[in-house]
């Protein structure tokens, strides 16, 4: 053996020994990261070949990122690994792993443009390696989506679908198609979403031979289909898809179902999973909560929220993934609205504070940035329901200014319109109704929200004593609400229509409207409609000289009033009530002493329709 060969063999032995030692220290209990890094650093003293040097720099970067806060040193090692590996042939794993990790590091330091540039270069170089090409396309599209650059994200996913098709990777192609449908859904490109879902659905049914992969894709497909219908406010239309989704998730969660690793570990082009099954399980609960709330089943929504939150806490104990915080915030946002409908506003403000805490706990305020507008909207609803109208107005205006989501903006504007109506600001009311009408004439918004728009116009007409016009708008609302089983919108419309008929002296029609309104309101349950309806019933029974029923209606009205007043006192004494004063920056922490000031508006409402204000209306979803 020559001296050169002996030296090379000796060096190889050193590399292997040092790598083995480094791995030993890394996997020790507890890990000894300092010694692990020292072993990897020692490799460089042997002036190793380029590929060994690049791999070692990558390993250093991985260890520093995973176990230390030394981001700068991690970046230097990864940049060194990239500069060495970029021109090397047949070295894809190190080259593209480095690019992927560098992009993650840039995101950690809030340098999204650097992350995109890095990945664009890697995508360009990876065209002959389908696995890495698709993986990097997914990563890059995710960053564009997070930055709300949806068209760019969509284009990249279309490229991924083509690449997967050329490679004969049908499972991967469907993943790209469904991911693109999700982006198009955010962009509200309704027709494009339908076309993609139909295309993906046919492939899932006919071209995915592996039954386990097929079921996973089916869950992804059904989640999107359910979200699509819910975004359009089609609560009745969505029921068959939701039922199918619930059955599919039960199949996947069954004890005899194989692990994700065994389903997706066989072929490199099938090692892509949208979400692991445990997270899918939470997501199905979430869309079920959304459906229950929109349909007006508050008890169901509460039950499923509690189950989902319990599941999230279990998963957090195993591994605290960032998506679990996203799920938790969205669930809390839903349940807050349910609490307010039921008159539990003190519980609602506590849960708004809990959502705030989840947002503040996520690094770089990334979750707060995404949900700040929703939090302002919820605080606006809370302020409105506790009669802090000035605070409510400011909260809704902040929400409108912060959000780019059309439905959320419409939702906030409709509630602003009700504030202007109740505070007799006719010019502001006209301006906002005209703006809402113009913005939504040529777009297909949620049926629930558009029904809400007609309801507000009916309420406006009622306050102007334009009873014929009020009936016209409310019948349109009822038509939309009944078509899709939007029970809360139906009950609100019926009780207002009853009040319209009462105002024009048609007690028979008024009774015909208020009776089903109260039945629905007790099922939901909606304390505001019950309060309003009981006042109407009291007047109707007084007019018909039915003393016994008049007494019952009055007793019910007093009961609902007292419940709301007691809850109001709790609200304004809660430390979390201070959130009504948050209008910019980070929301304040509210664990201090309770507040003691009571607003004038907390006085008991009179049990008479002549003095009764229209109840705060919240129209369906805004996610």
Curated annotation (Swiss-Prot):
Domain of life: Eukaryota
UniProt entry keywords in alphabetical sequence: Cell cycle, Cell division, Chromosome partition, Mitosis, Nucleus, Repeat, TPR repeat
Matching InterPro entries: MAU2 (IPR019440), TPR-like_helical_dom_sf (IPR011990)
One GO term describing the cellular component: nucleoplasm
Gene Ontology BP terms: cell division; chromosome segregation; maintenance of mitotic sister chromatid cohesion
Compartment list: Nucleus, Nucleoplasm
Pfam families: Cohesin_load (PF10345)
TPR repeats (start-end): 96-129, 451-484, 491-524
Keyword Cell division: yes
Protein's UniProt keywords contain Nucleus: yes
Subunit structure: Interacts with Nipped-B to form the cohesin loading complex.
Family according to the record: Belongs to the SCC4/mau-2 family.
Task of the protein: Required for association of the cohesin complex with chromatin during interphase. Plays a role in sister chromatid cohesion and normal progression through prometaphase.
Protein's name in the database: MAU2 chromatid cohesion factor homolog
